[in-house]
A protein has these predicted regions:
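Conserved alpha/beta-hydrolase
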Residues: 35-54
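The serine-hydrolase catalytic nucleophile loop
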Residues: 22-32
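Residue in the alpha/beta-hydrolase core beta-strand immediately N-terminal to the catalytic nucleophile
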Residues: 86, 108-110
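Catalytic nucleophile-loop/oxyanion-hole region of alpha/beta-hydrolase
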Residues: 53-84
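The conserved beta1-alpha1 loop
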Residues: 16-22
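Short beta-strand-to-loop junctions in surface cap/lid or active-site-entrance loops
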Residues: 1-13
Length: 156
């Protein structure tokens, strides 16, 4: 399990909330707080490569890593004795929640703005590279270096 785990133990019903691609648990924090007020145990893991100062960390990870983070979060709750577990996710987090719904004994699940299969182009790559450039410029990277990294990744 990654080191960044927001876990508030309350009642016997547990919910795992997964954040979006390039996001953090802050993406789902409002929902988590509301559930906590209703006596739900809430676990909001930070997916590998996310919430890092260096945006290159996210490029070291992929869907298999994030699904593994989801499975580890689920197993954390099971190991702590929870049997009534629900999973919800935003965007990428919804993909992880869906994986858990299909492969684990979850009570309920939900997705918010999750990716679907599309035959047309999406804006996800464009938005990602805008985010990446913004983060790298904050670290002092030059535009040429950012473009070089983008080309290297896109041509893998």
């Amino acid at each position: 399990m990654n080191k960044k785990l927001n876990y508030e133990k309350k009642g016997p019903k547990a919910v795992i909330l997964f954040h979006a691609f390039t996001g953090t648990p802050l993406d789902v924090n409002t929902v988590g707080k509301a559930l906590g007020r209703e006596n739900y145990t809430v676990l909001m893991p930070t997916l590998d490569g996310h919430d890092e100062e260096d945006p290159n960390e996210i490029l070291k990870c992929g869907i298999k890593d994030w699904v593994k983070n989801g499975e580890e979060a689920y197993q954390t709750l099971k190991a702590d004795g929870y049997t009534d577990i629900s999973v919800f996710g935003l965007s990428l987090g919804g993909v992880i929640a869906t994986h858990l719904m299909l492969n684990e004994d979850v009570k309920s699940y939900g997705v918010f703005s999750s990716p679907v299969i599309s035959t047309s182009k999406t804006n996800v790559p464009k938005i990602f590279w805008q985010w990446y450039a913004f983060k790298m410029k904050k670290l002092g990277a030059k535009e040429a270096d950012i473009q070089s990294k983008q080309s290297a990744v896109m041509n893998r």
